Swiss-Prot record:
SMART domains: CDC37_M (SM01070). Co-chaperone that binds to numerous proteins and promotes their interaction with Hsp70 and Hsp90. It is found in: Cytoplasm. GO terms for cellular component: cytoplasm. Forms complexes with Hsp70 and Hsp90. This is Hsp90 co-chaperone Cdc37-like 1. It comes from Xenopus tropicalis (Western clawed frog). Keywords: Chaperone, Coiled coil, Cytoplasm. The lineage of its organism: Eukaryota, Metazoa, Chordata, Craniata, Vertebrata. InterPro entries: Cdc37, Cdc37_Hsp90-bd, Cdc37_Hsp90-bd_sf. The keyword 4Fe-4S does not apply. Gene3D superfamilies: Cdc37, Hsp90 binding domain. Its main location: cytoplasm. It comes from the Eukaryota. Residues 35-73 form a coiled coil.
Length: 285
């Protein structure tokens, strides 16, 4: 079954939002359990029913997400996109797609790319909160998308430690955005609440975050492995080298294959110097 990117994104967002609501309900239930009165018993029963419903919803979204991941690349960039020297010139130079708001997204990345990359290298809650307090406009879906693209690029280069660092920050941004939606707030006004809960490691919240982070890292690895497999197939000779008179045909087909727009998928030319600087930054932050 084919799913549009909007369906994939909606599924991922709903899954995160459901996890957060589930954590909220669990915390409420734990709080009510500390009191012993008839009214509290009624509230506890209602909270338990809400918790059960959220658990069912979470399982349903997980099933949908699993179905999407089997047939689609769930919104990660394709090999073609990565083969455009994405991080040499920033991902604003990808082949343009006819989607609403594209111009605004490009303008946003042009303006904030360096700061997004800096945020992606932060590893401590306090540092991330302070940086977003300085640059609240970074709290946006454009930032989350850029971080996801960066994760995919890093894993394709087998820079696993950097990928895991950026994935952490991508999930941070995704959770903040979904928290804002569930509270009907501007994301720039509620990111402090996220960090407050994260730093306290309240029951339910931190577990939901860690679960989502592991899922993202697993999907990034799976996506990169699929891209490497496809690249290996494209590079495989169409004929064995000992076919004698067919050697000319083999060479011709090899030339055709190498001229294919996907042929260089394993010969990416990323901005090595910039990513070396990112690695140094991660070590010092």
């Amino acid at each position: 079954m084919d799913f549009s990117h909007s369906q994939q994104n909606e599924c991922a967002r709903s899954s995160v939002a459901c996890k957060w609501s589930l954590a909220e309900a669990q915390q409420k239930l734990n709080s009510l359990a500390l009191h012993n009165s008839e009214s509290m018993d009624q509230e506890q029963a209602m909270a338990q029913a809400e918790l059960s419903e959220l658990q069912r919803s979470e399982e349903e979204w997980r099933r949908k997400e699993a179905a999407l991941s089997q047939g689609e690349n769930w919104g990660l960039p394709t090999t073609d996109g990565l083969n455009q020297d994405v991080f040499n010139k920033s991902f604003i130079n990808q082949v343009k797609k006819s989607i609403d708001g594209e111009d605004q997204s490009i303008s946003f990345i042009q303006k904030y790319e360096a700061k997004i990359r800096h945020f992606g290298m932060l590893s401590r809650w306090n540092d991330s909160q302070h940086f977003l307090s300085e640059y609240p406009d970074l709290v946006s879906e454009e930032t989350a998308k850029y971080l996801l693209l960066w994760c995919s690029h890093l894993e394709s280069e087998q820079k696993t430690a950097l990928m895991e660092q950026v994935a952490h920050q991508a999930v941070v941004m995704q959770f903040i955005i979904e928290m804002a939606k569930s509270c009907n707030m501007d994301p720039r006004g509620c990111f402090r609440l996220f960090f407050q809960k994260a730093k306290e490691e309240k029951e339910g919240y931190f577990e939901a975050f860690k679960s989502e982070l592991e899922i993202l890292k697993s999907k990034v690895r799976q996506h990169a492995e699929c891209q490497r497999y496809e690249a290996a197939i494209l590079r495989k000779p169409a004929f064995p080298p000992d076919l004698g008179h067919m050697g000319t045909q083999q060479c011709h087909q090899k030339d055709v294959l190498q001229s294919h727009p996907n042929a260089a998928v394993c010969h990416l030319n990323p901005m090595e110097h910039a990513e070396d600087e990112d690695l140094k930054m991660m070590d010092t932050l």
